[in-house]
């Protein structure tokens, strides 16, 4: 029987501990069992004393004492009475719960000081405190309410705090969930305040990063208990920021909490990615020693889940308990309890074995080893190492020390000059080569597959020792030998860098500039020689770069004698993108493609990548594997060799030997044949940033180059002092100059059209560079850097001096490549282009037309005057071919005509002022000389040109329009406008070139003065262009400013002007002989240009206002043609060619005038013509187009027959007539002229005679005043019709395409009719003799019209200038508004498109997830349905069997037996009963008889008595 303590003993123990600091009575009290009926009486001060004692001990942090006090109060709580009332109720009213809150806060401070360390005493103290709290909680409802209101927030805050130990948080959650489980109904309002809601939201966030599954379950359980299921649906979106997590949380049901919580937490932990701290894997089976642990018995629990908790460093899972109801039992394996673990694969299962430090007991099972079987596909190794650490892994062996082997090296040279680097300890290097050759057969098999670096160096060393081949004179494990063939010595990097042993290098680790991995492929040539193997590792790997580098710094012997005739796998070293990104656009690389290469370039049998560096094959001798050299992964400085640091070579002989400039045959052949081509492609790449490159690799069957997209930039490290060969240097420099990142082996068809530098020129630069560097490289070590710097500066100078035209044409090439060019003539074009390269023999340095200040240009400032150095005579023809853009130079003009519109439309985007412009589809884009312009579609094939060489003055046959139009292109001409200060020579001089007459050769004669040669045209073109410059300085400045070209010095202009003026009288004498060509010839004169042959004064009516503009254009063109550097055809160039109608020398002859002639001479010309052929400048409107509006108007009127009013010479209008009426009119005028007296003719009559002559075939000879009259008529006509230009321009757009066929039909009809309508009106040469006083009459008319012409010329200049400005303003505003509106719409559409694409991606991802879920659910449903059907079948079978056995067969037999036995028994019983009844009846009868007899005897005796 327990000893009953004194009722005052508890308070006395508290007093002793508080006053005397004596805790022994309190400890003794703990050892005594207190009966329930014992009452411990305490005073009212008991709570104060208890609070003082606990607070003092908490301040002292005496954990054990506090635990003893809490345990004592907990045990005696129900027996305490204060003033006759229950002690706890009284203390609750006195504020026990509030005092416990202060205890909890002080305890929390102790907890936080311990951090995450596990202190058993602190955990016991907290557990005791919570036990006492639960006792108080169960006293009454008031205690519940106070505890809930006071402790729930503090417990939630403890759970949220990540500084608190996980075990304490788990204990607090358990107690809180117990409280919430027994919460009274009226206490739910306590959990609805804002503080609790905020804490619940924080607890929801805590689930994501808590790192312990049990704690996650406790938090989820607390959240579910603190809210009702309906309210949980609303608050879930506040607790979890992601909707799908909130939706998953809402699916948790209270009745199935365990399984639903498992699904929810697996989802949450799975989506965390790198933040994931709880890894859950399904386990196949689990054993504790020899006992198997069973999965909890829950139908909805699909797998036996094992949780790896990285936050709490525990492994936890749930098993079925041993009790009857098989409750869930949690098993937790802390990291400190595990002594060792191992992971191995057994029978296609992955086994995790945990060896524990002590024997543990789970339920009723004991063991020291925990065996967990997983599926072999699960990756649990890394997670297990993170959980338990790598030191406890069974296969982990700690490295004790580090051994360093240092080896000296001899550098030997064999007979062929090859270097043999041999360790000193190796006795026979030559003999050992045989061993290496034998090893190659085995090594080649392994080199074909990419290798992965090993996880640890110990494994590598172990494998190396296993794979080692033992030979009598084998070198050490850490030594390596190598042979550098003489043929490769200067193309490979310095051999010193390749002689690496296992000794750690003190040099700085090479910078990693790799963005993605490339598989390395070893290629073996026919002779069995292996070449370089490059193994690139991902930068994202978690491996140690130093260890990898140490592992890779091993070399092996290589026989490389047969290298000359075999292709080596080029090491593709791409330069760093950022080095030149500020100067040029950088190309991005698309996925590699492997089309045929030889169809584009025939001499690419040994194509090389730019900056290729063949590295001698490095293979390990002591292990049968190959490793990537650290030299394969390094960076290149932007200066190519500017910051090379010194590295001492092992041998002075080797150091000097590597400086010699020796090139083997194969190196010279491969590099020289491909360097120009590579640089051409590089230049093309920088000029075409719009289009991405496509990579083509040669020998696709042997190579497996994997080039990643966009950011695959492997860089080149120029080795420290010896560096690489001269060829490699120049290739690097050239490729850097053109700013290419990755050079294609074979560019695509588009890129092949954009070469801007000829092969010959590039090879001449390379050769000159070689010759300059050879003596420098032969100097001593001290002069190497000087020579390198000089060669670099020379290359940079050559690059910037010769590539100005590349910069100026960069903008022009982008839209040109975009046009829809036909691919048919590509091969033919390549041949032509290569032929032009062979013609180019001179390198001339001339600045481009663009005055751009290049900060890297060492020889030119944008403000300097250009210096023109002309080469040999053949330069002008060849440089144009070499410089022209391949995408614009066409072999067939027909292909060009089909894409004129698209080409010109794209050109607009480059110009400084964008305008919508129409071009004639008959114009010629570019032709540089007579032989290069193909206008075969304008004339019939093989038509002979018949010239009129006679001096006959009365020739009346008109010239063929078609033949003339062809000569406009075939033989250029020029137009000259002389200065106005010459009194009587102020008229246009038109130099007529070769002309083609009608096909009726019998009626034509040749004129020996009508001669034109290409050789004589260039000089006169220069001279006259400068005359035009003096006459129109302001217009010329406008032209040149917009075209971004530079003027020639004034001295040169004056020289040309003087020469042109001297040659003027001779030209004037020739004019009279060409007057007979008539008005039709005058139509062609608008497109004529200056030549050294005879000229004509015949001027088309629509010529006047074109010439000045055309002359400025001609000057602009001449300036360009003088440039010795190739200049690709620019958009301004093409557009000017459309506007030039007064040029003959210029190869950019427009067909405008030719078409106008055909239309004017057509029978249908009486109707208003659609000005389809009127050209409008596509370039900047302020360029050259001072008379663009008048040009349209002029072209319209010159293409129709006219009648002139004789009332005023200043107001003459054209009225269309039919050819017949025109001929009648001319005839009447002719008759009137003959009938009238010569002196009675007034000036107005004479004017009418001159101006009423038919436009198609009137040929009149006479003095040169006729040109002035005709010009004046044109100006008056234009002045009277200033507003028709806009209508003309609108009609151009409508009839641009449809007029080409009509033009040909009109031309054919006109050819037939003009021969019939030959003008009968003519004025003989001796008209002055027939008309007396004609000289005076002529002078009066001439002076009169001269004055009127000057006045009208000024008026028209002012008008055209104002009209041009107005048109420019409107067109600029229209273009800006249209472009801005289009850009806005495009931006809006792009934003909408991107948004919709994002939505589509999200929807597709949702559909994929849904599909995956459906698939999973379907599989589960099918599996369960199969199991269900199987069980149903088993059930039916069992029932049937039971039924058959129980009812049908056995029951009948049994019942029959029972019936038989029962009947037998019944019969026996009935017989017995019958016998019994009969016996009783017999006995009763006998008794009655006896009684009767007795009574009878008694009566007888009585009677007797």
Curated annotation (Swiss-Prot):
Known function = Major component of the axial/lateral elements of synaptonemal complexes (SCS) during meiotic prophase. Plays a role in the assembly of synaptonemal complexes. Required for normal meiotic chromosome synapsis during oocyte and spermatocyte development and for normal male and female fertility. Required for insertion of SYCP3 into synaptonemal complexes. May be involved in the organization of chromatin by temporarily binding to DNA scaffold attachment regions. Requires SYCP3, but not SYCP1, in order to be incorporated into the axial/lateral elements.
- According to the UniProt record, list the residues that bear Phosphothreonine: 471, 503, 613, 638, 922, 1174, 1318
**Keywords from the named record:** Cell cycle, Cell division, Chromosome, Coiled coil, DNA-binding, Meiosis, Nucleus, Phosphoprotein
GN (gene name): Sycp2
Top-level taxonomy: Eukaryota, Metazoa, Chordata, Craniata, Vertebrata
Q: What is this protein called?
A: Synaptonemal complex protein 2
Outline the subunit composition.
Component of the lateral elements of synaptonemal complexes. Interacts with TEX11. Heterodimer with SYCP3. Interacts with SYCP3, SMC1A and SMC3.
Residues recorded as bearing Phosphoserine in the entry: 457, 465, 494, 507, 516, 525, 534, 651, 655, 746, 920, 1121, 1123, 1130, 1146, 1150, 1162, 1165, 1170, 1188, 1218, 1221, 1237, 1280, 1283
The species this protein was found in: Rattus norvegicus
Q: Which InterPro entries match?
A: ARM-type_fold, SYCP2-like, SYCP2_ARLD, SYCP2_SLD
Q: In which tissues is it expressed?
A: Detected in spermatocytes and testis (at protein level). Spermatocytes and oocytes. Meiotic prophase cells.
Has the keyword Cytoplasm been applied to this entry?
A: no
Among Pfam families, the record links this protein to: SYCP2_ARLD, SYCP2_SLD
Name a biological process GO annotation. female meiotic nuclear division
């Amino acid at each position: 029987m327990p000893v009953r303590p004194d009722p005052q003993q508890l308070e006395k123990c508290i007093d002793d501990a508080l006053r005397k600091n004596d805790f022994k009575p309190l400890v003794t009290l703990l050892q005594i069992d207190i009966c329930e009926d014992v009452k411990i009486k305490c005073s009212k001060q008991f709570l104060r004393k208890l609070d003082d004692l606990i607070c003092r001990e908490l301040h002292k942090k005496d954990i054990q004492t506090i635990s003893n006090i809490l345990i004592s109060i907990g045990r005696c709580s129900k027996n305490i009475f204060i003033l006759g009332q229950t002690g706890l109720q009284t203390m609750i009213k006195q504020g026990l719960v509030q005092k416990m809150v202060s205890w909890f806060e002080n305890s929390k401070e102790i907890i936080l000081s311990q951090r995450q360390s596990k202190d058993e005493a602190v955990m016991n103290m907290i557990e005791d405190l919570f036990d006492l709290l639960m006792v108080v909680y169960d006293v009454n409802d008031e205690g519940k309410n106070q505890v809930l209101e006071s402790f729930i927030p503090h417990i939630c805050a403890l759970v949220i705090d990540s500084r608190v130990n996980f075990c304490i948080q788990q204990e607090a959650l358990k107690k809180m969930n117990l409280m919430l489980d027994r919460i009274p109904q009226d206490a739910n309002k306590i959990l609805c305040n804002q503080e609790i809601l905020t804490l619940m939201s924080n607890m929801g966030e805590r689930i994501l990063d808590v790192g312990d599954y049990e704690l996650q379950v406790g938090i989820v359980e607390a959240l579910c208990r603190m809210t009702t299921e309906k309210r949980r649906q609303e608050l879930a979106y506040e607790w979890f920021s992601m909707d799908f997590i909130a939706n998953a949380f809402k699916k948790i049901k209270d009745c199935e909490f365990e399984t639903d919580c498992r699904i929810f937490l697996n989802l949450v932990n799975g989506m965390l990615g790198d933040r994931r701290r709880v890894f859950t894997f399904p386990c196949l089976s689990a054993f504790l020693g020899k006992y198997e642990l069973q999965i909890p018995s829950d139908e909805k629990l699909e797998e036996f889940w094992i949780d790896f908790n990285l936050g709490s460093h525990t492994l936890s899972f749930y098993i079925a308990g041993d009790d009857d109801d098989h409750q869930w039992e949690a098993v937790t394996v802390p990291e400190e309890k595990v002594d060792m673990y191992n992971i191995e694969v057994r029978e296609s299962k992955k086994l995790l074995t945990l060896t524990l430090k002590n024997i543990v007991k789970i339920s009723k099972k004991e063991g020291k080893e925990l065996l967990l079987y997983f599926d072999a596909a699960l990756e649990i190794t890394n997670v297990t190492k993170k959980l338990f650490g790598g030191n406890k892994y069974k296969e982990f062996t700690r490295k004790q020390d580090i051994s360093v082997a240092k080896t000296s090296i001899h550098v030997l040279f064999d007979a062929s000059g090859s270097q043999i680097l041999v360790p000193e300890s190796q006795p026979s290097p030559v003999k050992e080569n045989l061993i290496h050759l034998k090893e190659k057969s085995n090594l080649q098999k392994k080199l074909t597959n990419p290798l992965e670096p090993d996880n640890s160096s110990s494994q590598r060393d172990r494998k190396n020792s296993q794979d080692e081949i033992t030979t009598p004179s084998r070198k050490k494990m850490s030594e390596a030998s190598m042979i550098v063939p003489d043929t490769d010595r200067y193309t490979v990097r310095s051999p010193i860098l390749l002689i690496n042993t296992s000794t750690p290098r003190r040099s700085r680790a090479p910078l990693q500039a790799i963005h993605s991995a490339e598989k390395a492929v070893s290629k073996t040539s026919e002779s069995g020689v292996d070449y370089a193997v490059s193994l690139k590792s991902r930068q994202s790997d978690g491996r140690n770069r130093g260890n990898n580098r140490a592992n890779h710094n091993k070399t092996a012997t290589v026989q490389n004698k047969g290298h000359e005739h075999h292709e080596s796998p080029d090491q593709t070293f791409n330069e760093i993108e950022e080095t030149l990104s500020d100067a040029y656009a950088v190309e991005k690389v698309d996925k590699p493609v492997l089309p045929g290469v030889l169809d584009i370039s025939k001499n690419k049998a040994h194509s090389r990548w730019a900056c290729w560096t063949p590295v001698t094959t490095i293979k390990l001798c002591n292990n049968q594997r190959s490793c990537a050299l650290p030299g394969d992964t390094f960076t290149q400085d932007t200066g190519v060799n500017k910051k090379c640091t010194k590295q001492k070579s092992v041998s002075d002989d080797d150091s000097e030997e590597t400086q010699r400039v020796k090139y083997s045959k194969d190196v010279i052949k491969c590099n020289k044949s491909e360097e120009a081509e590579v640089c051409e492609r590089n230049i093309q790449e920088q000029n075409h940033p719009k289009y991405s490159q496509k990579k083509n690799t040669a020998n696709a069957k042997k190579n497996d180059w994997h080039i990643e997209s966009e950011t695959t930039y492997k860089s080149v490290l120029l080795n420290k002092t010896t560096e690489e060969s001269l060829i490699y240097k120049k290739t690097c420099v050239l490729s850097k100059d053109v700013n290419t990142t990755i050079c294609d082996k074979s560019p695509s068809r588009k890129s092949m059209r954009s070469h801007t530098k000829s092969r010959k020129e590039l090879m001449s630069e390379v050769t000159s560079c070689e010759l300059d560097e050879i003596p420098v490289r032969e100097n001593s070590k001290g002069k190497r850097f000087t020579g390198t710097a000089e060669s670099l500066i020379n290359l940079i100078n050559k690059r910037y001096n010769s590539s100005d035209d590349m910069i100026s044409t960069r903008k022009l090439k982008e839209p040109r490549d975009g046009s829809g060019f036909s691919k048919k003539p590509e091969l033919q074009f390549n041949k032509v282009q290569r032929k032009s390269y062979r013609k180019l023999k001179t390198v001339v340095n001339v600045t481009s037309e663009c005055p751009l200040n290049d900060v890297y240009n060492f020889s030119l400032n944008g403000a300097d005057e250009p210096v023109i150095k002309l080469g040999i005579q053949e330069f002008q023809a060849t440089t144009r071919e070499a410089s022209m853009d391949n995408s614009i130079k066409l072999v067939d003009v027909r292909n060009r005509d089909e894409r004129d519109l698209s080409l010109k439309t794209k050109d607009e985007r480059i110009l400084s002022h964008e305008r919508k412009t129409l071009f004639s589809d008959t114009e010629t884009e570019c032709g540089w000389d007579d032989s290069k312009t193909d206008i075969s579609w304008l004339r019939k094939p093989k038509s002979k040109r018949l010239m009129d060489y006679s001096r006959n003055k009365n020739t009346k046959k008109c010239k063929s329009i078609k033949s003339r139009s062809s000569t406009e292109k075939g033989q250029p001409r020029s137009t000259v406008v002389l200065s106005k200060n010459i009194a009587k020579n102020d008229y246009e001089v038109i130099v007529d070139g070769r002309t083609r007459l009608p096909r009726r050769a019998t009626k034509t004669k040749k004129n020996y003065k009508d001669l034109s040669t290409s050789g004589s045209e260039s000089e006169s073109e220069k001279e006259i262009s400068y005359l035009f410059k003096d006459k129109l300085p302001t217009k010329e400045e406008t032209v040149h400013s917009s075209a971004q070209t530079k003027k020639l010095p004034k001295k040169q202009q004056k020289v040309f002007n003087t020469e042109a003026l001297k040659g003027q009288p001779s030209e004037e004498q020739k004019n009279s002989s060409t007057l007979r060509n008539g008005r039709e010839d005058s139509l062609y004169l608008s497109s004529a240009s200056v030549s050294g042959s005879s000229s004509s004064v015949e001027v088309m009516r629509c010529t006047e206002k074109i010439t000045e503009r055309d002359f400025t254009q001609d000057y602009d063109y001449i300036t360009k043609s003088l440039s010795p550097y190739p200049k690709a055809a620019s958009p301004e160039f093409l557009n000017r060619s459309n506007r030039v109608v007064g040029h003959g020398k210029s190869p950019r002859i427009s067909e405008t005038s030719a078409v106008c002639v055909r239309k004017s001479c057509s029978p249908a010309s009486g109707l208003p013509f659609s000005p389809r052929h009127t050209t409008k400048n596509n370039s900047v409107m302020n360029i050259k187009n001072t008379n663009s509006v008048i040009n349209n108007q002029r072209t319209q009127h010159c293409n129709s027959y006219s009648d002139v009013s004789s009332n005023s010479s200043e107001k003459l209008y054209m009225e269309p007539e039919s050819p017949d009426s025109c001929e009648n009119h001319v005839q009447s005028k002719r008759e009137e002229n003959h009938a009238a007296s010569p002196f009675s003719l007034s000036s107005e009559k004479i004017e009418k005679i001159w101006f009423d002559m038919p436009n198609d075939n009137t040929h009149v000879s006479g003095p040169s005043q006729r040109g002035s009259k005709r010009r004046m008529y044109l100006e008056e006509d234009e002045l009277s019709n200033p507003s028709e230009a806009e209508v003309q321009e609108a009609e151009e757009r409508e009839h641009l395409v449809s007029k080409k066929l009509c033009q040909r039909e009109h031309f054919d009809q006109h050819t037939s009719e003009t021969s019939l309508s030959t003008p009968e009106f003519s004025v003989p040469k001796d008209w002055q003799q027939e008309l007396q006083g004609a000289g005076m009459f002529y002078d009066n008319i001439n002076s009169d019209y001269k004055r009127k012409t000057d006045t009208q010329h000024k008026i028209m200049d002012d008008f055209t200038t104002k009209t041009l400005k107005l048109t420019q303003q409107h067109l600029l505003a229209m273009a800006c508004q249209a472009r801005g509106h289009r850009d806005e719409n495009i931006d809006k559409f792009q934003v909408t498109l991107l948004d919709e694409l994002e939505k589509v991606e999200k929807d597709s991802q949702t559909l994929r997830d849904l599909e995956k879920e459906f698939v999973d659910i379907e599989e589960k449903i099918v599996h369960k349905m199969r199991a269900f059907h199987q069980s149903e079948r088993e059930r039916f079978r069992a029932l049937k069997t039971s039924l058959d056995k129980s009812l049908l067969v056995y029951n009948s037999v049994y019942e029959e037996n029972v019936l038989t036995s029962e009947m037998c028994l019944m019969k026996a019983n009935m017989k017995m009963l019958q016998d019994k009844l009969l016996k009783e009846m017999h006995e009763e009868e006998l008794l009655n008889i006896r009684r009767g007899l007795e009574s009878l005897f008694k009566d007888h005796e009585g009677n007797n008595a």
